[in-house]
């Protein structure tokens, strides 16, 4: 199942949510993975809190290390491979329906970065984009950049991700997408977005962030060295 989310001032920018069926066990596994990663960075890589957080201005040490790990590497959890296929199927549908790319021409070279965000009391993500300044600084050409978020666990109250109009005259207009556990929302990487705050005094807000890129083949190795990307469709080979 999928949901199309809103129109920006008459301009349709594809912000599309896909629903993972029966997400309870997957989400429990993802909470365990995110908690374990957070413990590692807090206890072993304490100084990494000074790393870039991608413009989100969050206190979450995981977000400050978003390019240092990939949740999809954790294949000791049986649900991760199934989840990766769901992500792949969702991106396939999005690419075929909402982009000018031919999926059969891009699927062999789509790479995905997938990290965890864990927001505590009062925390939220400031307005930011996922378009990589690292790649543009090094003059790498990205034929395709698509991002996503996956909602793992609510803090116990409604939260929203707000997607802002890319039209200069309407920069403060946004489409709010209610966060729902088990929903994967795909959007163009250039779209600015932020989140509402976690108001719970005791519970964290768990999500995954994702970037999918399709680098030119001659630049792929150099681009991949900047992160911990996995080939999205490698399990199909």
Language model region names:
Residues 30, 159-163, 237:
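Short secondary-structure transition/capping segments
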Residues 21, 119, 151-153, 211-215:
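Solvent-exposed residues in well-ordered beta-strands and their adjoining turns
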Residues 73, 78, 98-105, 125-127, ...:
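Short helix-to-loop capping/linker segments positioned immediately adjacent to catalytic or ligand/cofactor-binding
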Residues 108-186, 196, 203:
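Catalytic core of non-heme Fe(II) oxygenases with the double-stranded beta-helix
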Residues 1-102, 124:
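Non-heme Fe(II)/2-oxoglutarate
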Residues 166-237:
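Catalytic core of Fe(II)/2-oxoglutarate
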């Amino acid at each position: 199942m999928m949901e199309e989310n809103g129109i920006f001032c008459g301009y349709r920018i594809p912000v599309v949510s896909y629903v993972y069926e029966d997400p309870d066990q997957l989400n429990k596994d993802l909470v365990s993975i995110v908690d374990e990663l957070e413990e590692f960075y807090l206890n072993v890589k304490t100084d990494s809190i000074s790393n870039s957080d991608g413009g989100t201005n969050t206190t979450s040490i995981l977000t400050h290390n978003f390019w240092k790990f990939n949740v999809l590497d954790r294949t000791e959890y049986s649900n991760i491979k199934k989840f990766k296929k769901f992500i792949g199927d969702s991106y396939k549908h999005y690419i075929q329906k909402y982009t000018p790319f031919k999926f059969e021409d891009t699927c062999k070279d789509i790479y995905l970065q997938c990290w965890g965000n864990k927001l505590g009391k009062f925390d939220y993500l400031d307005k930011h984009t996922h378009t990589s300044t690292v790649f543009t600084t090094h003059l790498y050409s990205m034929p395709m950049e698509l991002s996503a978020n996956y909602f793992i666990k609510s803090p116990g109250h409604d939260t929203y991700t707000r997607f802002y109009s890319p039209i200069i005259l309407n920069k403060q207009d946004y489409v709010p997408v209610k966060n729902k556990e088990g929903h994967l929302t795909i959007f163009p990487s250039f779209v600015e977005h932020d989140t509402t705050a976690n108001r719970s005094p005791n519970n964290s807000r768990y999500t995954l962030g994702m970037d999918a890129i399709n680098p030119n083949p001659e630049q792929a190795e150099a681009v991949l060295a900047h992160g911990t990307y996995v080939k999205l469709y490698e399990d199909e080979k």
